[in-house]
Structures are given as C-alpha cells and as structure tokens.
Amino acid sequence: MKTSMTLGGIGPRLALLCLPYVILSVIVMVRYPEFFDLRFFDSSFIKVLGYVWLGLGMTFWIFSGIFFLKYFKAGKLITLGPFALCRNPIYSSIIVFIIPSLALIFHSGLIFSISLVLYIGFKISIHGESRLLRRAFGDEYNIYEKSVNEIVPFPRYLFRGKSVK
C-alpha cells in the first residue's frame, strides 16, 4: 500500500485501466468511421459548441496543471484556484471537457464512451489517493472533501445558498 502522494497520482493506474479501451476505440473509429456516429450532432452549432467546450477544457487543464506543479511540492493540501472548483481538476478537464468536446466536434458516440470509461476508471482508482489525503491532512481534507465536488467543476455552495469558508 502506498504511503505518500506522487506527482503522477492515479494517472499511471488510470492509464493502465483505460488505455486498452481507448486504443480499441481509436482503431474502430479509424476503420469504421460510421460506427456509433451521432448524426444528430452533425451541425455547425454543435461543432462550435464543441470548440468552445474544448477551449474551456484546455484552459482549465493548463491552469490546473500549472497550479498543481506550482503547489504540489509544498506538501500542503491545494484548495485554491481550480482545486476550489473540484478536487481533481486535471482529470476533470479531460473527462468532463476535452473528450466530450471532441465527441461533439466529430459527432462520435465512441469518443463519448471513452469519457465514460475514463470516469469509471477514475472512480475505481481514486479511493487510494483519497485515503492518503485523509491520512496526511485529516480534518482539513474531510472538510474540503465535503465542500468541493470530486470531478464536476461547479461550486456546491451555489445550490446551498451559503459560501464555503
């Protein structure tokens, strides 16, 4: 059992879990482009929406990565910036923004399914990391965990009518 956090987090495990499906999906998309084609998404409006979503996702990913690299080595719980919106903003940017935006742009159900598989892999893999964070930061992490979404970058307090302190 791991006893300390690593810079890669659950990334390597998530890659091992999901990479075979991603590779298979890409092969199927290249060989049979009509397979799981979502024709009802084949419009200019949806494509533009996909590009906007992709821009948001790439911005969120870059900002999250820079923020993480800047503050990880300090050994403190990161709760500001993108980490104030969700506990796993780097994975969020990929699973919630980047891959779904590509699915919209290419009107592909297979690309959407990659996002779903990554989310399932994320849910399977994240528990060990959460345990390490609970052990390392105690009540501070428990409070953070209860006040910030795991992967959807949307402030919970907007629905509760009170701010997070």
Regions found by a protein language model. Give the residues of each.
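Membrane-anchoring alpha-helices and their flanking helix-loop junctions
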Residues: 1-79, 94-165
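Short, amphipathic, aromatic/basic-enriched membrane-interface segments that mark the entry/exit
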Residues: 78-89
